[in-house]
């Protein structure tokens, strides 16, 4: 019986499910499912619809089942700087902002008051970009601190 491995790649404008397996000693890859992706404009904010994204992940998995190619494992890769805050019951807290939202404007200066840029870079090794998670978290701390309680 073939062993299949599923990779779900979710980018800013599209997502896809790639199924891999070994055939004659070589890795064979097949795109199983593809979907459009993007942030929604809501009340002047750029937000991800995580419920829709979850539905797309499930739809791709159902396509694998329909094809009779059930993966033994799967991995999901996303855009890396966005996140979802959860409460103690694993419920989403607040909006799920996209990295292109402007709420982080000026947050680099706020973070620098606590941790100088050179020190931040030394600790993280990450190039300074205003959409980095550290600036998003500072925006939460300043704009909606109740979410961090």
Regions found by a protein language model. Give the residues of each.
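N-terminal glycine/serine-rich phosphate-binding loop of ATP-dependent small-molecule kinases
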Residues: 1-94, 122
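Glycine-rich phosphate-binding/catalytic subdomain of phosphoryl-transfer
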Residues: 59-149
